[in-house]
Regions:
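Positively charged, polar, low-complexity stretches
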Residues: 2-81
Length: 81
């Protein structure tokens, strides 16, 4: 998704759970501009996942198997909790 705009990402951060809306939206606003391309791809990947999985990673303490995705989860939890 190389042509995805911040406005499109902001819209995709709106989920079915208020907690996810806040965490994802806050990371986008605080960290997106300074994120490297790998972290940006991981964030776009994260937005494609079902809400229960995202909640398990961000709130439930579980981790995705991919190291890059896990690093993004750690970054969101560290900077947006």
């Amino acid at each position: 998704m190389p042509d995805t705009t911040v406005a499109q990402l902001r819209w995709r951060c709106r989920r079915g759970m208020k907690e996810l809306d806040l965490l994802l939206g806050e990371w986008l606003e605080r960290r997106w501009d300074g994120a490297d391309p790998g972290k940006r791809r991981s964030f776009q990947w994260l937005l494609e996942q079902p809400d229960p999985e995202i909640a398990a990673w961000l709130i439930g303490g579980l981790r995705p198997g991919d190291a890059g995705h896990a690093a993004l989860i750690d970054d969101i939890v560290r900077h947006c909790h």
